[in-house]
Amino acid sequence: MEKFEREIKESKFSELLNKHFAASAIPKGIHCLSLRLTDEYSSNAHARKQLPSPELLPLLSDNSYHHFVLSTDNILAASVVVTSTVQSSLIPEKIVFHIITDKKTYAGMHSWFALNPIPAIIEVKGLHQFDWLTRENVPVLEAVENHKGIRDYYHGNHIVGSNLSETTPHKFASKLQARSPRYISLLNHIRIYLPEMFPNLNKAVFLDDDIVVQRDLSPLWDIDLKGKVNGAVETCKGEDTWVMSKRFRNYFNFSHPLIAKNLDPNECAWAYGMNIFDLRAWRKKNIRDIYHFWLKENLKSNLTMWKLGTLPPALIAFKGYVHPIDPSWHMLGLGYQDKTDIEAVKKAAVIHYNGDSKPWSDIGFEHLRPVWTKYVDYSNDFIRNCHIMES
């Protein structure tokens, strides 16, 4: 019996490890889409047309419009975020989307939105087009990229250092979740520079690429943040262990003296992924410097303060500057658990597939995928030719 139990446990660990690698990989169809659109950019003048057209350029900094920022290298995911936002809007012509991507994806991303116009204003920018965003100006970026401990942690052997005989599958799954390579991507950290990236904007809504918008979001601009910087849904009021019952103790190592001295383990956490930012209020605070300071301290302490991505330093940097918004604005967890209540999903303004089981991957939950796929245009030639099939 002990032998069988050990084999079952080892099999579960193997399953979790395979799932982790599946979640980290780029699906073949999405990779194909990026390559074909990049090729189109070089051969088709229509794919290179200016976005937005010259007469609309002043609207990119017009504060009477609703500005959304999306940072991603996933073209298909970006198209779903933009399409769902526009289709759910009562006034799509008042929407401005600022899409930020990396250098390798820029041409393909630009091609997609140039060839598939929508009734909103679209801007596509590559990180390489922000002159001030260099490793010299932001030294912590170079440190994050080149730190050996970080490279080993996110790209090394995920079994070494894990005592499988003394851990549970649940704990092992949590550790794997914390080791996703996307957590050290500059595209993931870029939101901390929003005031510098958009110096003329007063407010902006930041959206992750694994969300779907189901309701008009224009009322977000009417929410009084009461002088705070970040309007976000709190994630400490629910009962499920994966998503909505998170406090600072879930993210930080309180045996570290610097953490124990500065933070309260019972303080409520909040969600990244759909945030309304008051950029005017933000510019008066030193949020970015605090973020950088704690990133550096965690590097110095060999990642012993926290492991999981960009949320922990943001929890510290925005401490005292977060205004809770109604939970119906942002429902999380669709990439974690397959028991998600479909009726609750239908009522949420924004649903978030945070977690490993993304709707565009093979390990996405079947009953939650149609809410995402209904915003994919399967008649599009590029999507058909890359065999991105409707499930």
Regions found by a protein language model. Name each.
Residues 1-391:
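Glycosyltransferase catalytic domains, chiefly GT-A lineage
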